[in-house]
Amino acid sequence: MDGRSILDENLKTVERAIIDIKAQSKAPSTIVAYGCDLRRLARILGEINLTFQDLDKHNLVGLLNAVKVNEAGRTLSSGRINGLFSSLNALMKYLEYTDEIEYNAIPMFRERYLTSYKRKQSTGIPRQCPTNEQVKSVIDGSPMIRDQAIHMVLAKTGLRNKELRALDVSDVDLVEKCIIAKHTTKRDGLKLPIDDECTVYLDRWLWDRRTFSGANEEGALFLNDRGSRLGRNTLLRIINRDGGRQGLHDPDSDIRQLDRRYTPHVYRHWMTTTLRESGCSERVIRYIRGDAEGSSADRYDHLRWETVQREYLAAMPLLIPRP
């Protein structure tokens, strides 16, 4: 087959694999990510005249070398490369299950090459963790009450980008001072405490939110300018923009230069560090972060909400003192 025919064959294989992955009830975001990765791999394999069915332990090293640099000429991070091969593993499992290949060589390959590759390629650069004063300056410098509330909620809860965007108005209780986060594969703890300061910013936003188009019909807590649920890239742009205004985000930095990038995940580091330095117990911190229990005994020793709220409020600092 020529290159075009190989590409067409690879893309058909991808579509069949995606149908199978959907049947496994994978998360929608996982399905989208797998689809993007596999279509990219389909093109790369087409360029080197290989179908997915041709892949074995002898030619996977060549594929690894081919994917290290993206279309923009940037060298991919070890995490990104591992992500590509994780997607490829899902497709190869499908081909093995349907007897289109004799065996799936990806697990053996990843153990031999990607573990050491990740260790060698790690940048060793810690993600940026702002000071209290820097977080305050970002919030103060944000131009809209919506964006100020976003920064405040991220800082006070440590929610991830996706988790914050999934929040609905009904998930916020300003009386009990808590937020109910949606259950995800990465989050166990659902009921999260917030302090008076975060409550004030949310109250201001909920008042201002009424003026947004579609506010009555859309249940999402944070809306975009069209009145729909805030998107991933829009949220990232807000955080990047406001961090950049305070000199905390370099838009020209490489994605691996974590110390020069101000992203939603920065707040997760800030919250964890702040609570720990203020004496909050590790178990409460794990609960707020949504981490799994530390031991099997933790499943029987129930962590009471009153304990979570008390320790959290004692450890969480006031960022913007009232005049």
Regions found by a protein language model. Name each.
Residues 15-29, 35-120:
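N-terminal core-binding DNA-recognition domain of tyrosine recombinases/integrases
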